[in-house]
């Protein structure tokens, strides 16, 4: 699932089928994440032509280790007004293919040594997904225990970012914690989780 269709945000038919099989299987194994929702309703939103770029973004989430799945907690589930389904990165730990990145491009440019290849904000934008907010991260953690060994960057309020900081979260001691770092920092056990509205 690594190669896209002529570098466009489209998948080849065989890539699409492999991805949909993986998504359907994960959906069926984790019904606690989306009680009352049927896979057929989700797949209908992913069918061409509307699902083209969305499938590409889901494939990027999958390719980088996010294990995307539809999540329907009370506060952040299907949008009743728009009828959207929302896919979240549901890997047990922060996605392996997105680790060792700083927070954003400004932070990347400030690094004098150990230049990094990417940053969380730009990487998410290139994938067509959104970083989780603190509220969204906490709601996700109500479903299962995520990030017990890793941590994930989250959207940082402008006032904190203006002063050079950035926020990240994890779960330790059966509690969800929010921390701060310099935005230019990076760690092998820190990545980011995203969401995709379909």
Stretches found by the model and what they are:
Residues 2-130, 134-198:
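A binding-site-centric feature that preferentially detects glycan-recognition modules on secreted/surface proteins
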């Amino acid at each position: 699932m690594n190669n896209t269709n002529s570098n466009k945000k489209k998948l080849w038919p065989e890539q699409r089928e492999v991805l949909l099989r993986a998504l359907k299987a994960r959906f069926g194994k984790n019904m606690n994440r989306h009680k009352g929702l049927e896979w057929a309703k989700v797949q209908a939103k992913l069918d061409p032509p509307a699902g083209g770029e969305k499938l590409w973004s889901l494939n990027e989430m999958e390719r980088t280790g996010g294990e995307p799945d539809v999540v329907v907690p009370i506060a952040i589930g299907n949008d009743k007004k728009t009828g959207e389904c929302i896919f979240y990165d549901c890997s047990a730990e922060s996605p392996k293919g997105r680790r060792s990145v700083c927070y954003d491009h400004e932070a990347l440019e400030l690094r004098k040594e150990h230049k990094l290849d990417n940053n969380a904000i730009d990487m998410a934008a290139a994938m067509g997904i959104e970083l989780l907010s603190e509220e969204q991260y906490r709601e996700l953690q109500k479903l299962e225990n995520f990030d017990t060994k890793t941590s994930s960057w989250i959207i940082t309020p402008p006032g904190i970012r203006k002063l050079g900081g950035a926020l990240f979260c994890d779960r330790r001691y059966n509690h969800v914690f929010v921390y701060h770092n310099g935005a230019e920092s990076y760690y092998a056990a820190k990545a980011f989780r995203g969401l995709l509205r379909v």
